[in-house]
Amino acid sequence: MKSKTMNRRDFLKLQASLALSSSSLLSLLGAFSPLQAASFSDYKALVCIFLEGGNDAFNMVVPTTTTGYDDYKLIRGDISVPKDELLPLKNTDYGLYNMPAMQEMFNADKLAIIANVGTLVRPITKIEFEAGIANPPQLFSHIDQQKQWMSANSNRLEKSGWAAKAANLLENLNDFTNISVDGSNFMQFGGDKPAFEISGDIHPFNNYGYSDPDSKISFDEILHQIIQREVESDHILIKAYADNQIQNIAYRESVSQAMENALEFNFTSTLDDEPGIPLAKQLEMIAKLISVHAQLPGSPKRQIFFARLHGFDHHDLQTIDHPLKLNYLNNVLQEFQDAITSMQLSDQVTTFTASDFGRSLVPNGNGTDHGWGGHALVMGGAVKGGQIYGEFPELTVVSGEYTSEYITNSGRVIPTTSAEQYLATLASWFGSYSDSELEIIFPNLNNFNEKNLGFI
């Protein structure tokens, strides 16, 4: 292999590629105490696809009846999607836009839609919202709403995400229970074991191009020597950081060895100017990791994966960009589900979407403002598909006033289902948690009558 000189920038980039979640330092310092729950012999995985920026779900799932569509078009105006392009969903009055594979999955009972879900402390009415009663803090803020979705708590700031807390409650908690293929995220932050984070491909050190094939000392040995000096430091944080880096090296080597036996998939979906790591590449990596889950250290029986599709903050050019993103998401989800099915793991792997928030129903030019409630997709063999769960608000206007008690004066939609209800339903399938354990993961769940939505 051709060797090359490593400069300071290269070294820092490599260090970043090795990094696990920063919660690993806290874990090494003993910040958390383990909790125990049931042990499992079967395998299950949850795959979260976070639609970052705020997906306009009311242009993803649209009424198809004459009256329903006319009301929708009256509110949405120039950003409404054409009725003749809607793909009907069986036994409903709604259709999907630009997502033919998802329509096919829904009609084959392999995909469910969760209607009007969002961050809530408890159920609230429009009157309460307008009066500022029981509203989640910092509504319509990207970073705050993302964090509330990822912590599953809209009442107070959390120190860890819901996936980290869910993993803590597993008896067979594993170093590879939580895996992100798009870098750091709060959903998997703060657990007793840090999330394993990947940005791009996994390489053993001798594949980075920095080792000299004629040298007796490999690059990873040199890096070990550098870190060893930090291990011998008297400073507790320096020692913890060094231990973390050594652990990361071992993790990378273990995963890269397992990946030598991974099944090959060929995800071909593309999206022009897609920011960040392409979702197709992320989900292809997840499929490969799932194919070798039994070969990872500890053979994890439960895994939560995090992927992210960027670019949903459509303040402009929504009618051009949003349909492309929906179709791309449709294609990649189909490719991923085909890969899972080919491994005969459809019943064991459940994929679901989440987003910062929905968008305002009323356009602001050629785009939309930040909203609140939106719709989510859940697919997999264990899903009770072919149904819409939850409640759609009525999209009717009389004399300039919205008649639905869930549409605010500014045209935003108050969620009728909480993110905690949605995520708790997924978690119940994933971990068979007791009611008391679900309360640890989802602190506001008892504020809602329906704790399990029954879609899985």
Place the predicted regions along the sequence by residue.
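Active-site lining segments that contact anionic ligands and/or coordinate catalytic metals
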Residues: 302-304, 346, 354, 371-374, ...
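Generic beta-strand/beta-sheet core signal
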Residues: 307-310, 352-354, 379
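Metal-dependent active-site segment of extracytoplasmic phospho-/sulfohydrolases and closely related
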Residues: 333, 340-365
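Feature for exported/extracytoplasmic and membrane-associated proteins, marking the mature portion
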Residues: 2-331, 335-342, 387-456
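Histidine-centered active-site microenvironments of extracellular/periplasmic hydrolases
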Residues: 357-388
